[in-house]
UniProtKB/Swiss-Prot annotation:
Region: Coiled coil, residue numbers: 329-349
NCBIfam families the record matches: myb_SHAQKYF
Family to which the UniProt record says this protein belongs: Belongs to the MYB-CC family.
Record's protein name: Myb family transcription factor PHL13
GO cellular component annotations of the record: nucleus
InterPro entries tied to this protein: Homeodomain-like_sf (IPR009057), Myb_CC_LHEQLE (IPR025756), Myb_dom (IPR017930), Myb_dom_plants (IPR006447), PHR1-like (IPR046955), SANT/Myb (IPR001005)
DNA-binding region: 266-291
Organism: Arabidopsis thaliana
Positions of the HTH myb-type domain: 235-295
GO MF entry, a single one: DNA binding
Amino acid sequence: MTLASDFGFPSAISSSFTILEERYHNNFPNTLCVSSGQESMNNNPVPCQVFPLVSGGSSGGNLFSSSSGFCNGVYVSSSSQARPSVSTVPRDRITVAHVSGEGQRQECPVETHSLQLINQPQEQKIMTWSSDQIRGFFDFPVPDPQAASSRTMVSSKEVLSKCEWPDWADQLISDDSLEPNWSELLGDPNVLNLYSKIETQSSDIARQEIVFRNQHQVDPSMEPFNAKSPPASSMTSKQRMRWTPELHEAFVEAINQLGGSERATPKAVLKLINSPGLTVYHVKSHLQKYRTARYKPELSKDTEEPLVKNLKTIEDIKSLDLKTSIEITEALRLQMKVQKQLHEQLEIQRSLQLQIEEQGRYLQMMIEKQQKMQENKKDSTSSSSMPEADPSAPSPNLSQPFLHKATNSEPSITQKLQNGSSTMDQSESTSGTSNRKRVRED
């Protein structure tokens, strides 16, 4: 690829290839041969844009780039180090013939919209290169990278004046096979100078920042003295003071006079003590310590008691748990026993009920048998007591024996009746005679 010298890349842009010597141009006057005989393609021309070659040392690339992105009619050998530039091409169909790296001849039909490709007549037919010309073609001198870089260096202004930016961009897009020569890039002193300049500038900027920070940095040991100096009164008021037993007794008396440590205030205690060198801060701190010391044993007792209670409760809970577990197990055992007994009783009751039902059935069967036997007996007695008679005869009655007895007893009854009538007559006769006698006496 060809880039400007400002970017540190060795490059040269030329439209006439002045770098090559004249003897190569003389040996190959007809590097591109034009054929006007093929006019069948003139009806459907395919536009193909032609760009000048860019010489970049030993690198090479495609020459043509069409509007569609490809130009199938052009083949360029990458082994050749220099090629003549193509300015314009006529509308006729042309054939570009050249020799590749292996010495093979290639024909490339190209159609363009320019006026002239090279100063040759259109009647000239396709020409081939001779072996003598090909021999001299490969006799190029070995290029020196340093000499080539020093020889082909061009300033940025000249590059911009000779080549416009759109053409250069299109050329970069079309030159797919162009690759940068990294050895030349690394060996270029301009690139190294550029990087050294950038490094020096960055180091200068870093130094300036460090100096600025050092100027504005403040010593941490001096910060409290520079920020705010505490007043002398606070320093004197916060001086430590040793509480003597006398002061403590006066302090306790003042607190008792004020109604206890909860109601006492540091200012009131200070007024009651009236000791020199004693401040409100001393009284306040001592009062706080007194309150905490007073409530500590109570709190400790209160805390010990709940701990003991908690321990007792835990032990009680454990014992209760054991007792309850034992009781629960015993209750479960009793319940199991009761359930077993109930189950046994239910089985006994069921067996008794079954036995009672069987006995009832047996009694019923016995009663039925007795009834049947009685009926059979009655039938047999009735059949044996009844004589055989005519069907017209009345049925025998059970009252006949009684009638027979009555007939047998009839004479006795008649006799009794006769005797009764005789007795009646005798009584009547006697009564009549008695009545006659009474009448006579009257």
